[in-house]
C-alpha cells in the first residue's frame, strides 16, 4: 500500500467505503483490506463476495497477482509525460510509471497567466488530475523539463535566412540558424538541431545544427527520421566493436557435442541472423508410445556477452534490435549478430539447447537444458519448408524430407493436440511487408501470408520458452517473465456494450477466458461482423510486458512464460539464458547477484525499449506507405473504418494497409454525434451511421 488511511470501526464496509479506502491506499490485497476493517470469519467471506461484485461491475481492477485498486484511478497529483497530440491539437498526458491500462488524461488549457513556452510532446509535467465530463483531465502545476531542446528537421534556405522545419508537421518548432552554421548544407538536408536557450518569446526560435542525417528525398529517409524521432540508439562505440571482434568460438570443454544432431534453421528468406534451430525424432521409449522428442537449439549469446562488460552495457541500453524495411539497428555488433552467434549452416556454433519430450496427446512430459556445440544441417526459408511439405521440394529440401522435415511436421501435429486443449487466443492480424528495390525505393507492399511453417516454429519456440520459465522456478532462480494480464473489467464492459449493438450476447459478469474469446471469434468468422469483432477483441486485450513478478500469460493461456529463444535481438532473453546458466551450474557467466537485484528495473527498461522500437517501426512503415501512395493522390481505394472518434474516422486501406483520418467535417453538413458504446458517428438529421469495421 502507498498510504495507510485512518482505521475505521470494525465491521464489513459498504462498497463506497471500500472504494474510498482503495483510492486512498492506491492498491491493497484482500488480507490488507480485511486487516484494515478488522474483519474475521464470515465477514471475510462477505468481503470476497463484495470484491467479486465490484470486479464484475467494472469498479475494481487487479493490480499484480493479488492486489486490487479502483479501475482507471489516477492520483490527485502526479508526474506525467505528454504522450499524444490529436489532429485538433489537444494534448494528452499519461502518468509516469503507470500500468499498461492506466488512462490518459486531457491536458487542459493553462489559464494561470504563467509565462514561458507551453508544454509540448515529450515534456514531463507535474499535474493535478480530476474527473471531467468526458474522462480524466490534467491541469499543469509545473513543467519539469525546461523545454524540448532538439528538433529533427529539414533545411530550407533563402537569401535572407536558413530555417529548420520540423519533420513532424504537428510541431511548431521552426528554427532559425546562422548562415555560418549552414555552410555546406543544402536545401532539403535532414538535420538534428538544438533549440538555443534564451528569453525569446516571440517569432521563430534560434537553433544550432548538431548533426546532418541525410537527404529529405532519399528513399531511405523514412527510417532515418523514425530512428531519430524516437531516439533509437544507433551504431556501437569503438570499444564495443573491439570487444566483439576479440570474441572466439568456445571449445567443446564443458559442452555437449550436438553436431551430429541434424538441426536446421527455418527463418524469413531475408533473415541475416539465425537465433534458433529445430529437430524432431520419434521417442523410442516404450513407456511413451506415439511420443516425440523435440530439440530447440538457441544461440549461446551469454558465452560472448558477459555481465557488466562494454558489450553487455550497450546491449542493455539498446534493449532489443529494431527492424525497418531497409535496415536493422541491431542490439549486438555484426561480428556477433551476423557472425559468431548466428547459427549458420555447416559452421560450429555455441548453443543453449533444450530437449523436450511430448506424449501422443501433445503434452510435454519432460525437458532438459544443456550448453552445447552444434552445426546447422540446413538453412531454409519458411516458404521453402512449406513448399517441400506441400509436395514441391527443391534441391535443398528434397534430400532431408524423410530424415528431418516429415518428423518435424509430425511432431508439430502432435504438439497441436496440446495447443488445442490449451486454447490460446486466436486473433488474426494483417501484417504487411515492404519490399525494397536495390536502389532503395519501394518495390511493393505485401500482406504477410501465414504458413503452417510459421506456426510450427512458433509453437516449438513457445514450448521452449515455457521450459525456461519452469526450470528457473523449479531452481528458485529469479527471472524476467513475459506476462500478459487478463483484460480489465472496464474493457470487458465496453466489449459487452459493443457486442450488444450487433446482436451478440456477452454476459458481463462472467470471467474472461481465451476459450470464451475464441468461441466469439469462431461464431462471427463467416459473418459481416468478422473483421470488426476481431478488431474490438484485439483492443480489449492488455499489452504484454516483461516483469520480475509473474501474473501468467493470458493470451497464450499459460501460468508461466519467459522469453528464451531470441537472445541475439532481445536483452530479456539474454537475462533468461544467464539465469539458466546460474540455476543449472552451466558456467561462470550466469546471472549475477547484482542483476538479480536489478531485475525489476531491467524489466521496466526493456519494456520501454520494446515500445520505443515498435513506435519507430510503425512510424517508418507509415512514412514508406505514404511515399508509395504519393503519385496516386485522387485515386479510389477500398478500405474499412478502424477507429471512430468524436473528431472523425480512421480508415485503413485494404491494398496497402495505409492508415488515414477522415475529419468529421468532411462527412457532410449535418452534425454527427459520437456513440462511444457502438463505436459509431451518427448523423443527427439523417441517422446515417459510420461504424467500426
Where are these predicted regions, by residue range?
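Charge-lined substrate channels and their catalytic hotspots, especially those that engage the 3′ end
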Residues: 1-295, 302-347, 379, 384-389, ...
Amino acid at each position: 500500500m502507498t498510504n495507510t488511511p485512518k482505521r475505521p470501526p470494525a465491521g464489513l464496509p459498504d462498497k463506497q467505503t471500500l472504494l474510498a479506502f482503495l483510492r486512498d491506499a492506491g492498491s491493497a490485497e484482500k488480507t490488507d483490506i480485511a486487516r484494515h476493517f478488522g474483519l474475521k470469519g464470515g465477514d471475510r467471506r462477505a468481503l470476497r463476495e463484495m470484491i467479486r461484485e465490484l470486479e464484475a461491475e467494472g469498479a475494481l481492477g487487479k493490480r499484480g497477482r493479488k492486489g486490487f485498486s479502483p479501475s482507471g484511478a489516477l492520483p490527485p497529483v502526479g508526474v506525467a509525460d505528454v504522450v499524444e497530440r490529436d489532429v485538433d491539437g489537444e494534448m494528452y498526458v499519461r502518468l509516469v510509471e503507470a500500468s499498461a491500462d492506466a488512462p490518459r488524461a486531457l491536458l487542459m488549457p493553462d489559464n494561470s497567466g504563467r509565462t514561458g513556452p507551453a508544454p509540448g510532446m515529450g515534456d514531463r509535467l507535474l499535474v493535478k488530475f480530476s474527473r471531467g465530463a468526458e474522462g480524466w483531465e490534467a491541469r499543469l502545476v509545473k513543467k519539469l523539463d525546461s523545454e524540448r531542446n532538439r528538433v529533427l528537421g529539414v533545411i530550407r534556405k533563402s537569401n535572407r535566412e536558413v530555417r529548420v522545419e520540423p519533420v513532424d508537421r504537428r510541431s511548431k518548432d521552426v528554427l532559425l540558424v546562422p548562415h555560418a552554421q549552414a555552410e555546406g548544407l543544402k536545401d532539403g538536408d535532414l538535420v538534428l538541431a538544438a533549440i538555443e536557450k534564451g528569453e525569446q518569446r516571440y517569432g521563430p526560435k534560434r537553433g544550432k545544427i548538431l548533426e546532418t542525417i541525410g537527404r529529405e528525398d532519399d528513399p531511405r529517409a523514412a527510417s532515418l527520421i523514425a530512428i531519430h524521432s524516437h531516439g533509437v540508439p544507433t551504431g556501437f562505440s569503438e570499444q564495443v566493436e573491439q570487444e566483439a571482434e576479440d570474441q572466439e568460438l568456445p571449445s567443446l570443454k564443458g559442452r555437449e557435442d550436438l553436431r551430429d544432431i541434424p538441426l536446421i534453421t527455418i527463418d524469413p528468406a531475408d533473415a541475416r541472423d539465425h537465433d534458433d534451430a529445430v529437430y524432431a525424432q520419434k521417442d523410442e521409449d516404450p513407456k511413451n508410445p506415439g511420443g516425440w522428442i523435440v530439440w530447440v537449439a538457441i544461440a549461446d549469446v551469454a558465452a560472448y556477452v558477459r555481465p557488466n562488460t562494454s558489450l553487455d552495457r550497450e546491449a542493455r541500453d539498446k534493449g532489443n534490435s529494431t527492424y525497418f524495411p531497409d535496415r536493422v539497428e541491431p542490439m549486438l555488433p555484426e561480428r556477433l549478430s551476423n557472425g559468431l552467434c548466428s547459427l549458420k549452416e555447416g559452421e560450429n556454433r555455441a548453443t543453449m539447447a533444450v530437449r523436450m519430450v511430448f506424449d501422443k496427446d501433445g503434452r510435454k512430459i519432460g525437458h532438459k537444458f544443456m550448453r552445447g556445440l552444434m552445426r546447422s544441417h540446413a538453412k531454409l526459408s519458411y516458404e521453402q519448408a512449406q513448399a517441400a511439405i506441400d509436395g514441391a521440394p527443391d534441391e535443398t529440401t528434397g534430400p532431408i524430407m524423410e530424415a528431418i522435415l516429415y518428423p518435424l511436421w509430425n511432431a508439430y501435429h502432435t504438439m497441436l493436440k496440446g495447443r488445442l486443449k490449451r486454447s490460446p487466443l486466436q486473433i488474426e492480424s494483417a501484417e504487411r511487408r515492404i519490399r525494397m528495390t536495390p536502389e532503395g525505393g519501394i518495390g511493393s507492399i505485401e500482406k504477410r501470408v501465414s504458413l503452417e511453417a510459421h506456426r510450427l516454429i512458433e509453437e516449438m519456440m513457445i514450448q521452449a520458452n515455457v521450459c525456461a520459465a519452469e526450470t528457473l522456478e523449479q531452481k528458485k532462480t529469479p527471472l524476467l517473465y513475459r506476462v500478459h494480464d487478463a483484460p480489465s473489467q472496464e474493457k470487458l464492459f465496453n466489449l459487452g456494450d459493443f457486442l450488444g449493438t450487433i446482436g451478440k450476447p456477452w454476459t458481463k459478469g462472467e470471467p474472461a477466458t481465451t476459450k470464451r474469446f475464441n468461441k466469439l471469434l469462431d461464431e462471427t468468422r463467416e459473418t459481416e461482423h468478422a473483421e470488426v469483432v476481431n478488431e474490438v477483441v484485439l483492443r480489449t486485450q492488455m499489452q504484454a510486458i516483461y516483469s520480475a513478478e509473474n501474473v501468467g500469460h493470458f493470451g497464450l493461456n499459460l501460468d508461466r512464460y519467459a522469453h528464451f529463444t531470441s537472445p541475439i535481438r532481445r536483452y530479456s532473453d539474454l537475462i533468461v539464458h544467464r539465469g539458466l546458466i546460474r540455476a543449472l551450474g552451466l558456467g561462470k557467466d550466469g546471472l549475477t547477484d547484482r542483476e538479480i537485484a536489478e531485475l525489476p528495473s531491467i524489466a521496466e527498461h526493456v519494456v520501454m525499449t520494446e515500445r520505443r522500437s515498435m513506435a519507430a517501426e510503425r512510424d517508418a512503415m507509415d512514412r514508406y506507405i505514404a511515399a508509395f501512395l504519393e503519385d496516386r493522390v485522387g485515386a479510389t481505394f477500398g478500405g474499412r473504418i478502424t477507429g471512430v472518434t468524436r473528431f472523425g474516422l480512421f480508415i485503413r486501406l485494404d491494398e496497402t494497409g495505409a492508415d488515414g483520418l477522415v475529419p468529421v467535417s468532411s462527412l457532410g453538413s449535418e452534425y454527427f454525434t459520437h456513440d462511444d458504446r457502438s463505436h459509431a458517428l451518427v448523423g443527427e438529421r439523417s441517422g446515417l451511421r459510420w461504424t467500426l469495421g
